[in-house]
Amino acid sequence: MTVKTRFAPSPTGYLHIGGVRTALFSWAFARHHKGEFLLRIEDTDLARSTAESVNIILDGMKWVGLNYDNADNVVYQTRRFDRYKEVIAELLEKGHAYYCYCSKEELEAMREKAEKEGTATYDRRWRPEAGKTLPEIPAGVQPVVRFKTPLDGVTKWADLVKGEISIPNEALDDLIIARADGTPTYNFCVVVDDYDMGVTHVIRGDDHVNNTPKQINILKAIGANLPEYGHLPMILNEQGKKISKRSGDTVAITDFGAMGILPEAMLNYLARLGWAHGDDEFFTMEQFIEWFDLKDVSPSPSRMDLKKLYWINGEHIKITTNEKLAEMVKPRLALRDIHETSKPALEDVLALVKDRAQDLNALADECLYFYKKQVPAEADVAKHWDDEASARMLRFAERLEGLEDWNTEAIHDLFKPFCDEEGIKMGKLGMPLRLAVCGTAKTPSVDAVLALIGKEEVLKRIRA
């Protein structure tokens, strides 16, 4: 059997990090088992689904690097209405579905009664049964189609995350599978799609647990093999509450990209939300695929920890090639009015500073003074700069100008003799030198920084 999983987002807005975590686990499960990972766009909500939102999903999947095996044949539910109508007709013909002519007022009265009695909402008055007389069909009412849910027994499954789950069928409604205008409903479309796509494992959020028994019963009615189900726990914010954009939480995957998070780091972090492999916190996607097993997913909710996300991001920055980092940092430097990054080469700058930043925005800031002297902070000036320091910098500039070989080692060899002559410690030279050349007291080793900036530029900045 070829393992087939799917990710099935609705294009009604941004791509939520919870959705990306679901996609990640489905993707990793398929890749671990040498199977297929498929994408389906559940766009039957015609009022809310937009082409822009579809592109947001596709772009988000591309950004995080979750490749799907049906890239040339992504399933769109709105293109499958004929297929849904075909299956509905089959269910009606075989007695697994029926027409219901209840009015909105009747359904509202049933709902209120059910809430008081704790029973299923719909009283099944239009459900055909042996020896039962159905009401007279009202004039001018377009019926819905309801699925004929079994009245006895239980629907159960061995959830790959939550364990055994059992739901009495008497607690389930005869759910609507086609609205009065003929459009199919979510739970029905999902079943037909999973069946036609050959999905073997449905991995999704635990907000779908209540949908599962309904979908299992429909699958049984159409004679399909049942997939296995695994329901993932919710992701909570740092306060332990449901993630919400209204609460100020970052929820869209694109927002994390704007925050300077690497795609690989985002996936690494999301993988650790609810799943564990010993004490491993930092790993590659190749390692994750090798290690991933749904039995290691906790059924309990996970809590966001932005501090840990940034730490993981910093670790991924360290192992990312300077060439790849340069492509991501250049646009950020352009936003900071730095457009020329060949002198010094940005790749060389990144090699020196990438250990000092935990996100791409901070990394871009670390590169600024290599291309343009920054305005020193008042606190740094007060602490490290005075007339004596200014005069000392001019004297040291003469030593620098005399260097024939301009490199880190040659610059470093000037420090001790100069400090001895001046009767000062290295801090009295290094900190003012950083301010004079870079405009900040916080840099990597100052000899390496000067070597990269270049002799002519260094002397010009000191003497400015």
Curated annotation (Swiss-Prot):
Keywords: Aminoacyl-tRNA synthetase, ATP-binding, Cytoplasm, Ligase, Nucleotide-binding, Protein biosynthesis. InterPro entries: aa-tRNA-synth_I_cd-bd, aa-tRNA-synth_I_codon-bd_sub2, aa-tRNA-synth_I_CS, aa_tRNA-synth_I_cd-bd_sf, Glu-tRNA-ligase_bac/mito, Glu/Gln-tRNA-synth, Glu/Gln-tRNA-synth_Ib_cat-dom, GluQ/Sye. Its EC number is 6.1.1.17. Pfam families: Anticodon_2, tRNA-synt_1c. It is found in: Cytoplasm. The keyword Ubl conjugation does not apply. GO terms for cellular component: cytosol. Signal peptide: none annotated. The keyword Nucleus does not apply. One of its GO terms (molecular function) is tRNA binding. A motif ('KMSKS' region) lies at residues 242-246. ATP binds at residue 245. It catalyses: tRNA(Glu) + L-glutamate + ATP = L-glutamyl-tRNA(Glu) + AMP + diphosphate. GO terms for biological process: glutamyl-tRNA aminoacylation. A motif ('HIGH' region) lies at residues 9-19. Catalyzes the attachment of glutamate to tRNA(Glu) in a two-step reaction: glutamate is first activated by ATP to form Glu-AMP and then transferred to the acceptor end of tRNA(Glu). HAMAP family: Glu_tRNA_synth_type1. Monomer. Belongs to the class-I aminoacyl-tRNA synthetase family. Glutamate--tRNA ligase type 1 subfamily. This is Glutamate--tRNA ligase. It comes from Neisseria meningitidis serogroup C / serotype 2a (strain ATCC 700532 / DSM 15464 / FAM18).
